[in-house]
Amino acid sequence: MTPRQRRLGMLLAALACAGIALALVLNAFRSNLVFFFSPSQVAAHEAPASRSFRLGGLVAPGSIRREGDGMTVRFIVTDKAREVPVVYRGLLPDLFREGKGVVARGTLDRSGTFVASEVLAKHDENYMPPEAADALKQAEQVNRRMASQLAEGERETQR
């Protein structure tokens, strides 16, 4: 083998190793990437059905139900436009309450219930995860638009 062929072989081997390393890093990154979705996005089927994701919003008032085993809790997460039922088995954070912000990590089952593997509550009364705050603002804007359209329709029918 000539020196030129050896250099070319070394270069190709180095490129192959770099490509394999890049593929492994991207695969690890992809498997650890968890997206955030609001209840409205989940209801619109924008959330992945087979992958883990985060669901954020408010715990709907009157929705917390504890099952007989003492560890399983069912509740509803809402963004004031849509609601998603959640089931969680484990200890809830001390700050978990109705009407307060929550972010849960888990998957959707076939019935549309979010099966949470982790539940996080906001840490004080002023904090809301940025994604959840944005989702709530968007839902409130949609609700206002719908209310104004309904009011316009009622005014037109009264004429």
Swiss-Prot record:
GO terms for cellular component: plasma membrane. Its main location: membrane. SUPFAM superfamilies: Heme chaperone CcmE. Residues 1-7 are cytoplasmic. The chain crosses the membrane at residues 8-28. InterPro entries: CcmE, CcmE-like_sf, NA-bd_OB-fold. This is Cytochrome c-type biogenesis protein CcmE. It comes from Cupriavidus pinatubonensis (strain JMP 134 / LMG 1197).
